[in-house]
Amino acid sequence: MKNRLLEKRALDSRLTSPDVTAKEKWLGYLLGPSGALLLNAVLATYLNVYYTDVLNLTTVWDGAFLAVFPIVSKIIDAVTNIVMGYIIDRTRTKQGKARPWLLLSAPLVAVTGILLFTVPSGNRTVQVIWVMLSYNLFYSFAYTIYNMSHNLMVPLSTRNTEQRGSLSVFNQISTIMMSGIIVALIFPMLIMPQLGVDKSKWIVTMSILSCIALPLTLMEYYFTKERITLEGGEQKKDSVAMVTQLKAIFSDKYMIIIFIYFLIFTVGSTIKNISLVYFSNYVLGTYNDGKTQTMLSVIGGIPMGIGIFAVWPLAKKFGKRNLTAIGFIFYAVGSAICWLAPTNMVIVLIGQFIKNIGGLPCSYVFMALFADVLDHVEWKNGFRCDGIAMSIYNTIAVASVGICTGIFNLILSKSGYAAPYTNAAGQLIAVQSASVKSAITFTFVGLETITGIVLAILLLFLNVEKNIAKEQEEIKQRNGETTE
């Protein structure tokens, strides 16, 4: 992106310090991202409810529409992630290479977020076209631009690993606050009962959330700074061919390990999240009892609150890799405890608490560890691969949702899942066989017992931190920057 508009002082970052500042942490990485992250978290949970319960799209194409169009859209989304990574790596502006796209995404996310819900009434064909277009305008266009640039803020913020780790923690706090507290607890208790199936209320509520995202994303833009991009020499370097970047990425053992790590973790956690409702309804609790899922969510949120204060000091002392590996041992043990007694509320809650304690390091310091790997690849090859590497990261996340949903539904089908129904007496019958309950239990706690062990072992080979300080100094000297 080359534009005279970006040369204007009015668009300069409000940060001038070479070191990370307090206002950068609080405004750029905690408060700023919260608007777009809140909107995305709400959509991830409730957009499908709007499609099925408010618009009644389950009848379109005999039910095939809502099964096919999200999968096709995710394929489009995966492609646009790769394209966006390519574009970011070739962006040269005074404001950096990712921040300009963060600025552009602010109005785009707000407008397309509103379009998702302002579906015209009446003609069904028009509704279907509107849904397909608005869904892809948001996810494959606007939010892809935001998410790619947002995720690169930590890796591009500074080479100081301690400061970068601190930003990673603040960034993750914002994510957890939006999805783990507001969407998982406040929204279902206070907001959803008021919305019901009233389309106008849905439009007003979601439009407000979309509009809130605009000023907060602008705040994120103004209170972030790409110190690495703006280093001496970085902006003067010629663009590197995409094939060359891909070769650099996939010939580096640390990058391969971290992508495998992210893939395994994402598959396990995604299938677990999909199965949460089913586990609450059929194994641990009863159908829509209104308390089981909330209790599991609360237990999941408590360790995340504790982790705000504990994780980074421990990561500095023991190392990001080491702490994360130890965490995954607790992750596996906690899941195994739940697996042993999946119908006992007390035991499951204890197991979930232990499991979520173990998941703290991967939640809070992963992006800092990923940033170390990006620096290592730069040291090794002489050029950065931020955009294309992040596009692969995002593609894994995007593709996993569709694939994991398909895997979970296949497991349910093969185990003999029976949909709830109302009998002649007007009673809701929601009963599953032992094989179905066993399958649901495996997807909720069994799979993560296995992935926890695998990830703990895999991380033993990710010793990128060992020489990262030395490599960063060599990069600075190579770029003509004075060593601090």
PLM region descriptions:
Residues K2-E484:
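Membrane-embedded alpha-helical bundles of multi-pass transporters/translocases
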